[in-house]
């Protein structure tokens, strides 16, 4: 009778392992191996051995349940998880806070710009005053689009200056002769 009980226990274990699909079932199967020897460097025979081992694995695959790994973004599942975290209830009554309205101040334009009537006017540095002052022909800096050929003494025409100098020298020479 002890033999019968032991025989009964083994099928139960195999049934349990088969139902669970655990490692116990895989451990009971014998492992198949093949030795490959080649005389040409192992190129063609190693490839055929790889093909044979791949075919054997393909034959063993239908007996084992295959696990499919999902790769990608599950947008729908993420939105449902976030939706449970944030809930919006429509029709909920909350007391509305009354914002005190400020009376608009009506100021005249002069009052808006002349708020500091008591303060003294801003003091300008002398350099800024000098630049803003219209000196005329003796402008110290020649700047701007219309200041081409302008020197310290105004616009200068070298040809005219040369003619003036010649006339003055001729006049001086003519006066000395008389």
Swiss-Prot record:
Modified residues (N-acetylalanine): 2
Source species: Homo sapiens
Regions of compositional bias (Basic and acidic residues) in chain numbering: 1-15, 160-178
Record protein name field: PEST proteolytic signal-containing nuclear protein
Residues with PTM N6-acetyllysine: 64, 150, 152
Modification sites for Phosphothreonine: 139
GO term, biological process aspect, one: protein ubiquitination
Sites bearing Phosphoserine, chain numbering: 53, 77, 87, 119, 147
């Amino acid at each position: 009778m002890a033999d019968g009980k032991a025989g009964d226990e083994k099928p139960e274990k195999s049934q349990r392992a088969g139902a669970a699909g655990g490692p116990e079932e895989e451990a009971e199967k014998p492992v198949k191996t093949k030795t490959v020897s080649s005389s040409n460097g192992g190129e063609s025979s190693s490839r055929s051995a790889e093909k044979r081992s791949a075919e054997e694995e393909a034959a063993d695959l239908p007996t084992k349940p295959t696990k499919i790994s999902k790769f990608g973004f599950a947008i729908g599942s993420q939105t449902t998880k976030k939706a449970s975290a944030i809930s919006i209830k429509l029709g909920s009554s909350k007391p509305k806070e009354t914002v005190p309205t400020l009376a608009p101040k009506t100021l005249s334009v002069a009052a808006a710009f002349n708020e500091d009537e008591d303060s003294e006017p801003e003091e300008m540095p002398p350099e800024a005053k000098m630049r803003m002052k219209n000196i005329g022909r003796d402008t110290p800096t020649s700047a701007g689009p219309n200041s081409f050929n302008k020197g310290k003494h105004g616009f200068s025409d070298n040809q005219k200056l040369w003619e003036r100098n010649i006339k003055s020298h001729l006049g001086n020479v003519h006066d000395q002769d008389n």
